[in-house]
């Protein structure tokens, strides 16, 4: 049994990790940390886990994380990078669900995240945890940078066309919408029910932290720098991401065949029949990314629709998928939950 530690177990990604890992047959959760809730039963804070998780939250200073096989960081940006070096030295493998190790250019990371990086020497080693492009590297990694929620949906939607050479790489457009859980569990005015319900708005139009992450991944896939306009939106739903992606085609291509062939062996990417319109509720609670491709009026613009659950494939589910790969377990183990409906 793998010994698991979770740093930051009280947010939405933390409780989603607990939900998934509590049903995983090959793991034992050793520690769940929270300074604020130290000493409290996990099931008291999260009644949904009653009968599944019998642990108490522990203070990070008292948790014996060095005895774990793998530690998940479900913490705000800037926390993991301060603790990861000592854990790696102790032989612990790391999966960071925050952004500390995603962006390879340290200056770019520091610009977007507004703080100096505490361990820049480890960034080059970190493997970007998108299995659909880095599966082999993930298997041997010590340190995984779990992708962001928007970057997962957007990159999986763009990848086949970007890799094919059939796309105008200078003018990619990603119009993405997220549920309010993507903003985290802290109390903020814009996510209050009275503010978010019956409302819809764009944000971060001049620049969002996920922009350099998406651009980095697509540029690596294309082996060429890409130009990307990324506009996120906040929608009045709890969980889910819907990305509408626009690509100008440079040559004739069978879009349906291209996407089906690219993802035929991917257990968590579902390419829908031609003309489909995926809905966020079709992936709610699952580790799936569902994609549909369109070519309006047979013109030179492809429209790709990509939907995920931001807390599962966009966070905790993908983290467990990476853990399975790292430890030689079946990739789909404990993350084949069917979507919730209605």
Swiss-Prot record:
GO terms for biological process: L-arginine biosynthetic process. The keyword Oxidoreductase applies. Its EC number is 1.2.1.38. It comes from the Bacteria. Its main location: cytoplasm. It catalyses: N-acetyl-L-glutamate 5-semialdehyde + phosphate + NADP(+) = N-acetyl-L-glutamyl 5-phosphate + NADPH + H(+). The active site is at 149. InterPro entries: AGPR_AS, AGPR_type-1, NAD(P)-bd_dom_sf, NAGSA_dehydrogenase, Semialdehyde_DH_NAD-bd. Gene3D superfamilies: Dihydrodipicolinate Reductase, domain 2 (3.30.360.10), NAD(P)-binding Rossmann-like Domain (3.40.50.720). It is found in: Cytoplasm. Belongs to the NAGSA dehydrogenase family. Type 1 subfamily. This is N-acetyl-gamma-glutamyl-phosphate reductase. It comes from Nitrosospira multiformis (strain ATCC 25196 / NCIMB 11849 / C 71).
